[in-house]
From Swiss-Prot:
Protein known as: Cysteine--tRNA ligase
Motif placement: 'KMSKS' region: 274-278
NCBIfam families found in the cross-reference section: cysS
Residue window of motif 'HIGH' region: 38-48
Gene: cysS
Entry cofactors: Zn(2+)
Binding locations of Zn(2+): C36, C216, H241, E245
Signal peptide: none
Organism phylogeny: Bacteria, Pseudomonadati, Pseudomonadota, Alphaproteobacteria, Hyphomicrobiales
Length: 468
């Protein structure tokens, strides 16, 4: 019934080649993946959450297909915005970075995002950054000037290949300041001097701190090697960040590629507008978690294909919540059978959808087909298979990991509904029915409906859920 992992071909859209390609790791049965993580100076917004959720699903799928997966997602803990936030608060930058790194982990955990295998901090790899810069200077791909180290863009003929931009677009798009010490307007900073009150490290070019782009190149080299299988991140990082990473690493490693596959998720938009602080339409993850279960926020992010822009809305989040109600309702309908989901429990059609460039909308359609069958199936053996398939498929998406009753009574219940009060009213209704006071039983059912609660009477008692 189910596809064997070693027979399933994973196809991924490679930004570098502008096409879908069959993915095979460089080393058989071992995959290396790096995803750009947060710059920790503020709370995470829904745009930060999208790559975390998307690449969490990819990591789950890779672990299903390959024996050994090494997934690294970094923490950028030295950057001008962090320095500014620390100065404004009158504290050391470590106070800011540790606080917001912790909040980021908590928020992502609430969305069901598993911790990466490696979570390197930029400040832990300063020595590796300096070593890489020294190599780039020695090869003529970088130069020192007035306490800065800059990458010599004209020295790398392939610069612009990842983003597909021409030279003028790249300079304008990066908003590169044409400082007098630059040999070329497109050259970008690898190292910059620090003032006495700014954080800094000693280097051959004086006390200073790294530029953003060199950080990821050095962390990848340190933890995963010169060439990795997959490099991921948001489409906003494609240029200049990823373009610069590619250039630095390629030149530092004798023109070997930094990554064999480059994957980028699309923007999160607020209606027809791009989400941005200047427009005042940024949605913070912790605010969304006060409105809906983390699992619903996660499903709303997976409801669109990862490469497409995602138009975020309250209705989209409410729809994701209703979808989970249906799926958990199907699991509740299967509560009378036991099933132990195995690694191959997810059905072929579901696995094929995920293996087709992580097509989560198509995979969800398969999940809902299973749920529809679960609600009408009567054969115990088939019901057990359906239950295993639902849980096994849900596990790959990072959903359906709760007990259905816990979902409807707790996480899945609307925040305004008092679960204890619902249970008290159901007990009173049951007592009224037992006493044959059907008018009172109907009155209580109506009161529950007004609260937004639907009840279902079954052979094992009365269950309830939030009404759709």
């Amino acid at each position: 019934m189910n596809t064997q992992p070693n027979k399933l071909k994973l196809s991924l859209y490679n930004t570098l080649t502008r096409q879908k390609e069959i993915f095979e790791p460089a080393e058989p049965d071992r995959v290396t993946m790096y995803v750009c993580g947060p710059t920790v100076y503020n709370r995470s917004h829904i745009g930060n959450a999208r790559p975390a959720v998307v690449f969490d699903v990819l990591a789950r799928l890779l672990r299903r297909l390959y024996r050994h997966v090494v997934y690294a997602r970094n923490i950028t803990d030295i950057e001008d915005k962090i320095i500014a936030a620390a100065k404004e608060a009158g504290v050391d930058i470590s106070v800011i970075t540790e606080k917001y790194a912790r909040i980021y982990r908590e928020d992502m955990g609430a969305l069901g995002v598993l911790a990466p295998d490696i979570e390197p901090k930029a400040t832990e790899s300063i020595a590796e950054m300096i070593s890489m810069m020294e190599r780039l200077i020695a090869s003529g791909n970088a130069y020192a000037a007035e306490g800065h180290v800059l990458f010599n863009v004209p020295s790398f003929a392939e610069y612009g290949r990842l983003s597909g931009r021409d030279r003028d677009d790249m300079i304008a798009g990066a908003r590169v300041e044409v400082a007098p010490y630059k040999k070329d307007p497109a050259d970008f900073v690898l190292w910059k001097p620090s003032t006495p009150e700014q954080p800094g490290w000693d280097s051959p070019w004086g006390r200073g701190r790294p530029g953003w782009h060199i950080e990821c190149s050095a962390m990848i080299e340190k933890h995963l090697g010169e060439t990795i299988d997959i490099h991921g991140g948001g489409i906003d990082l494609q240029f200049p960040h990823h373009e610069n990473e590619l250039a630095q690493s390629s030149c530092a490693h004798g023109h070997t590629p930094l990554a064999r596959f480059w994957l980028h998720n699309g923007f999160v938009n607020m209606g027809s507008e791009k989400m941005s602080k200047s427009l005042g339409n940024v949605l913070l993850v912790h605010e969304l978690l006060a409105q809906a279960p983390g699992e619903a926020v996660r499903l709303a992010l997976l409801n669109a294909h990862y490469r497409q822009p995602l138009d975020w809305s309250d209705e989209g989040l409410a729809q994701a919540k209703r979808m989970l109600d249906r799926l958990y309702g199907a699991l509740r309908a299967l509560s009378d059978v036991k099933a132990e989901p195995t690694n191959d429990a997810a059905p072929d059609a579901f696995m094929e959808a995920l293996a087709d460039d992580l097509n989560t909308p198509k995979a969800l359609a398969v999940l809902f087909d299973l749920a529809k069958r679960a609600n009408t199936e009567t054969d115990p053996g088939t019901k057990a298979q359906l239950k295993a398939a639902l849980i096994g498929a849900g596990r790959l998406l990072g959903v359906l990991e709760m007990d259905p009753e816990a979902w409807f009574a707790g996480a899945g219940a609307a925040s305004h509904i008092d679960g204890e009060e619902v249970e008290r009213l159901i007990a009173a209704r049951n007592a009224a029915r037992k006493a044959k006071d059907f008018a009172e039983a109907d009155r209580i059912r109506g009161a529950l409906a007004e609260m937004g609660v639907a009840i279902e009477d079954g052979p094992q008692g009365t269950s309830w859920r939030v009404a759709s």
